[in-house]
Amino acid sequence: MLTRKQMELLDFIKTRMDRDGVPPSFDEMKDALDLRSKSGIHRLITALEERGFIRRLAHRARAIEIVKLPEAMERAGFAPRVIEGDRTEPPRGARPVETANALDLPLMGRIAAGLPIEAITDGAQSVTVPSMMLSGRGQHYALEVRGDSMIEAGINDGDIVVIREQQTADNGDIVVALVADHEATLKRFRRRGGMIALEPANASYETQVYPDHMVKVQGRLVGLIRSY
């Protein structure tokens, strides 16, 4: 039997993994459950793990496996989901991209998961992605990640991120942001009054804060591809 907060956290983790392809950060969990500190999230995660609903994967940045779901969630159509950081074997049941229903997306260049770098938008190459990774309508494109500022969001140097092209974002979205019309970066988006905060997911980096007119959202993260 789960408490209300435990159920809320499990539901939030599942929802964000389905939406973004990566688990939420502890800060996002804290904000979503309206808790004052991350210690409360640690206790809830531990309780869910002890009850067999989730499993934390050692030595991987925020990798969480949802082992099972409460009966109420299963009846509503939820299914267990695993996001594992840098595992050496593909997930059980995974199929090669070429045998799945797949589409080619333009690989628009490299995106900085670190300090902003100049945007590269040649689109001369392409990458094949499962069509199920694309979120609804709209244009999509792919970028190669350079840097380690988003590792705690499960995004590593060398990963390919799938981006849905859009010009708006909600607080907490991981976005491609164009700074001062020439530097692109992959960060978590926060609006603070007339300012935009671009947050890393690595304690070694500082949040970048700009006047809102200096930041243009170019797209939102909807998927991630990693070579094993």
Swiss-Prot record:
Q: What Pfam families does its record include?
A: LexA_DNA_bind, Peptidase_S24
DNA-binding residue intervals? 26-46
* Sites annotated Cleavage: A113, G114
Any one Gene Ontology biological process term? SOS response
Keyword tags: Autocatalytic cleavage, DNA damage, DNA repair, DNA replication, DNA-binding, Hydrolase, Repressor, SOS response, Transcription, Transcription regulation
Q: Which GO terms describe its molecular function?
A: DNA binding; serine-type endopeptidase activity
Q: Which Gene3D superfamilies match?
A: Umud Fragment, subunit A, Winged helix-like DNA-binding domain superfamily/Winged helix DNA-binding domain
EC supergroup of this enzyme: hydrolase
Q: Which reaction does it catalyse?
A: Hydrolysis of Ala-|-Gly bond in repressor LexA
Q: Where is the active site?
A: S149 (for autocatalytic cleavage activity), K187 (for autocatalytic cleavage activity)
* Subunit structure and binding partners: Homodimer.
What job does the chain carry out? Answer: Represses a number of genes involved in the response to DNA damage (SOS response), including recA and lexA. In the presence of single-stranded DNA, RecA interacts with LexA causing an autocatalytic cleavage which disrupts the DNA-binding part of LexA, leading to derepression of the SOS regulon and eventually DNA repair.
Q: Which family does it belong to?
A: Belongs to the peptidase S24 family.
Instruction: Name the NCBIfam families on file.
Output: lexA
Q: What is this protein called?
A: LexA repressor
Q: Which organism is it from?
A: Cereibacter sphaeroides (strain ATCC 17025 / ATH 2.4.3) (Rhodobacter sphaeroides)
Q: Upper lineage ranks?
A: Bacteria, Pseudomonadati, Pseudomonadota, Alphaproteobacteria, Rhodobacterales
